[in-house]
From Swiss-Prot:
Subcellular location: Secreted
The name this protein goes by in its record: Vitelline membrane protein Vm34Ca
InterPro entries: Vitelline_membr_Cys-rich-dom (IPR013135)
GO CC annotation: extracellular region; vitelline envelope
Lineage of producing organism: Eukaryota, Metazoa, Ecdysozoa, Arthropoda, Hexapoda
Record key words, sorted: Secreted, Signal
Amino acid sequence: MKCIAIVSTICLLAAFVAADKEDKMLGSSYGGGYGKPAAAPAPSYSAPAAAPQAYAAPAAPSYAAAPVSIPAPPCPKNYLFSCQPNLAPVPCSAPAPSYGSAGAYSQYAPVYAPQPIQW
């Protein structure tokens, strides 16, 4: 048990020393690390700077702010066809409560397992 503790302590110490070496490589040839930032490039004086664009407010919308009211369509004529020689219009009303989207298929359909083939 003491041997495992000594070996793990040595490994931790070696990892700490290796990490400490990496911090001291600020000026190395691998990118410079976190040294001083590069100086800003000198401004170019070959042409005068363009004047900044003046701020222009956005144009007002061309549509009315209030929505246009659209009239409701007329109630359709529902005709009840029967064996009688006349057509009678059926008044519009709310649909009756039903089984929802299941409709007539609200029960599970029976599934029969086929008999295994005998060899």
